[in-house]
């Protein structure tokens, strides 16, 4: 096994040079897609040896990672099932080690035949020694299409999406609006106060749909517009206070660095005729961790057979947070190459994603 390195980040951002940072303003943050046992599709993970598909085996590795190796002050987890949260993680990370937590489950899709508790969702765990809990909310993205005005809804209705099956074969066409209504993705918002500095931030965790760029882009727009509302509600009537609210947006965005979603988050205007859409949260989110590290630190964060790429993100603003350390990921690619393995999970890695672990300082 090639050991990943949790190494310092050399900063070149001019506005942060010489800025005073308190030692106690440091915290660690992790985002990680755990790979739900319900999604260990036999037709996808043909390259995984049978013992390493076993949920009990994978769960033991996840326990070691999250409770010991990579335990962060804030942990944002995707594809955690409701059953697993209630039966294990709520107490193991929460009660036993003094972490608070919140969870939201997706609604079961039409094809779902398993118990509702086996449906996955997203969770956020936070170290109560460092943070006070303020509030939380969870949203179902297909129920918030009212964030769009009539012109935008008309575009969503008229825009056609070419539908494909799991093997990328074309199976039909539908309006973008109807496709969005049929998807069950969620987003979790948790507002925390950092004990030592009094800083308030909102932590977001989501897992966007795995295909159709326009669907992922629209889901991201919904999240950003809802976040804008949450910030206004967090400190009502206190404009100066709102300026102190900092944002950490994490999750599996199923989107590469050159995707529509990432371009939108970076502030690129999305234009459709005379319809121009822009990220309302750009003043709060101006970069992701990959903007502050050498390109060779990561090859992929997802190693799901033929589906590989950098899909997992932490977004923030460089006037709010300074990225000080990151757990490199290129060693995983080297490990797979050396062992002639197609992807993850394997004996050492319980998920087809690798955890993205960071350390930040509050500015």
Swiss-Prot record:
Residues 1-23 form a transit peptide. It is an enzyme of class 3 (hydrolase). It is found in: Mitochondrion. InterPro entries: CCR4/nocturin_mRNA_transcr, Endo/exonu/phosph_ase_sf, Endo/exonuclease/phosphatase. Keywords: Exonuclease, Hydrolase, Mitochondrion, Nuclease, Transit peptide. The keyword Repressor does not apply. This is RNA exonuclease NGL1. It comes from Saccharomyces cerevisiae (strain ATCC 204508 / S288c). The gene is NGL1.
């Amino acid at each position: 096994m090639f050991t990943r390195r949790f190494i310092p980040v050399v900063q070149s951002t001019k506005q942060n040079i010489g800025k005073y940072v308190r030692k106690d303003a440091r915290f660690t943050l992790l985002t990680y897609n755990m790979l739900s046992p319900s999604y260990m599709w036999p037709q996808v993970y043909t390259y995984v040896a049978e013992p390493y598909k076993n949920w009990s085996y994978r769960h033991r590795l996840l326990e070691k990672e999250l409770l010991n190796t990579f335990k962060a002050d804030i942990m944002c987890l995707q594809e955690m099932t409701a059953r697993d949260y209630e039966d294990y993680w709520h107490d193991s990370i929460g009660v036993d080690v003094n972490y608070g937590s919140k969870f939201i489950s997706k609604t079961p899709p039409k094809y779902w035949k398993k118990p509702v508790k086996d449906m996955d969702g997203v969770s956020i765990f936070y170290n109560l020694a460092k943070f006070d809990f303020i509030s939380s909310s969870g949203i179902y993205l297909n129920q918030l299409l009212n964030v769009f005005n009539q012109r935008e809804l008309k575009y969503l209705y008229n825009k056609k999406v070419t539908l494909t099956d799991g093997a990328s074969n074309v199976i039909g066409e539908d309006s973008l609006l109807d496709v969005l209504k049929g998807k069950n993705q969620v987003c979790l918002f948790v507002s925390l106060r950092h004990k030592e500095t009094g800083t308030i931030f909102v932590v977001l965790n989501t897992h966007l749909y795995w295909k159709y760029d326009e669907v992922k882009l629209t889901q991201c727009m919904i999240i950003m517009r809802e976040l804008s509302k949450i910030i206004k509600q967090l400190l009502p009537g206190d404009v100066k206070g709102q300026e102190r609210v900092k944002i950490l947006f994490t999750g599996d965005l199923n989107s590469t660095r050159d995707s529509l979603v990432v371009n939108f988050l970076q502030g690129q205007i999305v234009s459709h005729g005379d319809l121009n859409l822009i990220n309302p949260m750009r003043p709060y989110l101006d970069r992701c961790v990959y903007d502050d590290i050498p390109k060779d630190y990561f090859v992929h964060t997802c190693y799901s057979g033929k589906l590989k790429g950098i899909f997992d993100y932490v977004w923030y603003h460089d006037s709010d947070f300074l990225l000080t350390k990151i757990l490199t990921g290129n060693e995983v690619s080297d490990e797979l190459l050396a062992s002639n393995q197609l992807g993850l999970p394997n004996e050492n890695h319980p998920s087809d994603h690798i955890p993205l672990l960071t350390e930040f300082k509050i500015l």
